[in-house]
Design a protein with these regions (language model features):
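N-terminal active-site wall of soluble small-molecule enzyme domains
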Residues: 26, 30-95, 104-106
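Active-site-adjacent structural elements in enzyme catalytic cores
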Residues: 110
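Conserved small/polar residues in nucleotide/adenosyl-binding loops
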Residues: 115-118
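Charged, compositionally biased N-terminal leader segments and the immediate start
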Residues: 1-26
Length: 118
């Protein structure tokens, strides 16, 4: 997908969020758009970040770590999808939010690992 198509889709999505929020008497600021960036190059992420997109979602840890390390923009990373217990330590220090925690044991491990990183 080229940059102009990416911007066009992102802009359309933002407009849909604004319209939906207005229709139910809410502010679009109450909604967080997480741009799923898996399989997209770092250049696309930095281009959207430059336009104001802050939240990005990844579900492949190795790919995400490369992007996080290379990203100079002020973004907030989300881990989306299933998280394996063996990847909890690496995930805890790289992501602001982790979606899809499916057990208390995993949540406790993330909490412990997060404390050791912070």
């Amino acid at each position: 997908m080229d940059t102009s198509e990416l911007f066009s889709r992102w802009t359309a999505t933002c407009q849909e969020i604004q319209a939906a929020a207005a229709a139910c008497g809410r502010s679009a600021d109450d909604v967080t758009l997480i741009a799923v960036s898996k399989f997209h190059p770092l250049e696309a992420i930095t281009a959207l970040a430059a336009r104001g997109q802050i939240d990005f979602g990844e579900n492949y840890l190795q790919e995400a770590q490369e992007k996080i390390a290379g990203c100079q923009q002020n973004v907030r990373w989300h881990f989306i999808g299933h998280l394996q217990s063996k990847k909890a330590s690496a995930t805890a220090g790289n992501f602001a939010l982790i979606h899809g925690v499916d057990s208390v044991k995993l949540a406790q491990r993330l909490q412990r690992d997060r404390k050791s990183v912070v």
